[in-house]
């Protein structure tokens, strides 16, 4: 029987060198680690890892080849009160595995036990890691490196974006390949998108609770193997990595960046009643934040929280991020529940992972976007991330909806959000692009649902409509649900136009939710994380071409306005912005706080956004000059308007002089 050589303690994971495979695994509290390899017949062969350098266990298996399936059994104490839950009866996934064979099914054998260990062996049904070799021809691929000031983000789901697209070949719809298909790339280019932000593509599992209800985790925020691509999005699991990189290469050639939504805050092992896949059995005490009673700190709402202040976990997270940049050429990351990244346990800008990213010559050069909160006390950290990070700006989302749909926001508050929320982000040398402005995202109502539903309708999620937020700031315009009279449809359309214009012509970095540009609805479901069906898949056959053209025209207009693309804070008198009332005069203090919802925003001294957010048609006196309405608010041939615009109720228009 082949014996393991000691091998090397780095890098982490399984690496083929042409002669064999080096295996390394971190565990600070293990007493023994067994490498378990499986032959073509499924027969298991076990080897003790002979090397033990600090907290790294390692060994080298001569003659091992790519395609070898493996896992680990880790021996150590079962002391739940101390945070130790070692159970060598359970086969464990390598945290750095780059491919997984098998499915993460709801099975009692995939649990380690709660108070007492479950010593039933699970190797027969446990997913296995696969050794991969990395050979790929990137040709002349180069990152687009779009300046932040010119960035337009499009948030999309790999499957949902393309699964129903009639012009993409059936056999590749819903896959990585479809992202790189010319039809999709041409669409993104025509729309004006510069960055495609993908919901999680690292391998994830569906929670046992969902599986028992016949549902699945659709969004992907339940990670199980952070270095492995989710195989369900590949035409073939064995070629997933090549398919993904082919798509990135094609997108790069078109000048489109790729940003990955990544989940470093928790794992699919959930709470103590959750499954055992990997980290809990390898070194529970090190990988997770553990309470004094041995249970998890649940700062994520998902049952556990990764301890990103632990040096080994920081190394793991950093290696994961570098892998996606160096191996897959991704251009940035959006970090889910990113306040966890800064917990020590208190949130700190100089937390270990932030410092590691700042000091990394690879990671410090890509786009970094934080979802700047978690659910723990002190978890709301909007505006408090280190300067390298941009942040989701929920202030903007709520203000835009309140202004146009609830009519309860003063002009001053609206203008502050329009100006990149400088009261929040203008600090520590940060630029306006640090504010990722959004009106909608995957989490919440779609844009169409914002104007069609007053209340969430999440019954299909199986929680009796308890899940999902109740704070939607939506307005159904008098009738709950889709459809209605022509007048109702037109009023809803006008509100959509107003919200899109506010999003795409405000200072900061705009993020558009895929499907909003053609009227996609989730029928009032504002938490569709478990709906892998036509509720979430974009129906291109029903797409509103008029709304798509309107959105594209706004994006292309944005790119013409220096005040929006130069990425400099607006200062009084610098020519970037003037705030005027309905009479083209500067607003008084009282008008900012108590005046009617009528406003003119003059950008770069040439572009004028005239707003009438009142219930009545109102005359808006334009500033001096010869003005004409510009697309998408008018055709190419427009009469000159010298004095007054008849502003419709809840309307706006953009002019140029």
From Swiss-Prot:
Question: Could you tell me which residues belong to the region Disordered?
Answer: 458-479
User: Where does the sequence pass through the membrane?
Assistant: none
Biased amino acid composition, Basic and acidic residues = 458-467
In terms of SUPFAM superfamilies, this protein maps to: (Trans)glycosidases (SSF51445), E set domains (SSF81296)
Task: Name the EC number(s).
Answer: 3.2.1.196
Q: Which reaction does it catalyse?
A: Hydrolysis of (1->6)-alpha-D-glucosidic linkages to branches with degrees of polymerization of three or four glucose residues in limit dextrin
In this protein, the active site sits at 336, 371
Q: What does this protein do?
A: Removes maltotriose and maltotetraose chains that are attached by 1,6-alpha-linkage to the limit dextrin main chain, generating a debranched limit dextrin.
Please state what the protein is called: Glycogen debranching enzyme
- Gene encoding the protein: glgX
